[in-house]
Amino acid sequence: MGKEKTHVNLVVIGHVDAGKSTTTGHLIYKCGGIDKRTIEKFEKEADELGKGSFKYAWVLDKLKAERERGITIDIALWKFQTPKYYVTVIDAPGHRDFIKNMITGTSQADCAILIIAGGVGEFEAGISKDGQTREHALLAFTLGVKQLIVAINKMDSVKWSQDRYNEICKETANFVKKVGYNPKSVPFVPISGWNGDNMIEASTNCDWYKGWTKETKAGEVKGKTLLEAIDAIEPPVRPSDKPLRLPLQDVYKIGGIGTVPVGRVETGVIKAGMVVTFAPANVTTEVKSVEMHHEILPDGGFPGDNVGFNVKNVSVKDIRRGNVAGDSKNDPPKGCDSFNAQVIVLNHPGQIGAGYAPVLDCHTAHIACKFDTLIEKIDRRTGKKMEDSPKFIKSGDAAIVKMVPSKPMCVEAFTEYPPLGRFAVRDMRQTVAVGVIKSVEKSDKAGGKVTKAAQKAAKK
């Protein structure tokens, strides 16, 4: 069998018509986990509807529709392989909640693919001031997606013009630099997601294209296709050696077993026999067993695993979604009284001042928080201070803000526990701002509930 391939998570960003579905569909279709039967079924349907030529996007649209109707389609459909990696596409945008998903996302992306439409007029629209492209790229960078690949799509529509390609590369390089990426470490690939040029095999339509290069710590890496660029992602480091943080998605009561909290391990490891503390509930108890997909995990749950674990002497009323479990003996999680965050306002119709109290989505918590003090306005790219104690901030601004939650919540500094240190600010049914937590004022509440099981385990 050999060693299992490393898993990486990709997020695909770009303007609404850049061809994200077709390109992603093509990769999944050619290198992916969609079984032949499903493909044949979709192709037949596409042909019957006269959408035969549209098959990649059609396959993806079908999957998307099923996903949105809440049919939990086999998640393998969103996976494909490169020689080195198992790749999961964690969000194909065009999704209303794309921004929220990216922040509270079920997982952190290791790399973003920015798809740019090369068509005349299309490129200009996608990258314009108010373009979604800018917002998505900025988000990816702010939220710690350190690696980027740029695919310049629809090159067939400009007859594989080298001049057009160079013009777009130059503009896009400036664009990604403004967002915060170093263009030298970003591969640029001209593709046709539709016809498949430079997707998996090198194209015969652009003799002028000599391939992409990117600078890495280990030196220069070269390749030709989009698949090779994905294969050249630098392997991500998974935080299993950090203390445990496991935000709860749900808490179930299961007859004959008892209370079973469920969630995704973000950092550290959760094992049977461990004594965990839930914050901000301030409840401490012993973990009896840990399982995933109804199978016991003898070695415990690791970062990225969605696990259920059985706890003793705790009722469903004691803990809830949005609580965070951690190791009671190793930097246990705590509730917070306030926290300071770098907030970037994306789209708010008015001005935001002290006293504004929208809902924050941070990991699985969904809690109203007050903008207590606007400490300073900063330059979004460099982080340098521009103004002390601004009265207001508006769309496009970045500021350091002291936030006070309306009820107990557990968050962490982004530098220490990234998934618990980024949040979306929701108001008027949209994401109006995003934030990265700089520091947390933790509440040291004495007392709290320590179960008999925990006391017993401590004596062992």
Swiss-Prot record:
Modified residues (N,N,N-trimethylglycine): G2
Function: This protein promotes the GTP-dependent binding of aminoacyl-tRNA to the A-site of ribosomes during protein biosynthesis.
Gene: TEF
Domain of life of the native organism: Eukaryota
Pfam families hit by this protein: GTP-eEF1A_C, GTP_EFTU, GTP_EFTU_D2
Annotated region described as G4, given as residue ranges: 153-156
Entry's Gene Ontology molecular function annotations: GTP binding; GTPase activity; translation elongation factor activity
Protein name: Elongation factor 1-alpha
Record InterPro entries: EFTu-like_2, G_TR_CS, GTP-eEF1A_C, P-loop_NTPase, T_Tr_GTP-bd_dom, TRAFAC_GTPase_members, Transl_B-barrel_sf, Transl_elong_EF1A/Init_IF2_C
One biological process term in Gene Ontology: translational elongation
Binding site for GTP: 14-21, 91-95, 153-156
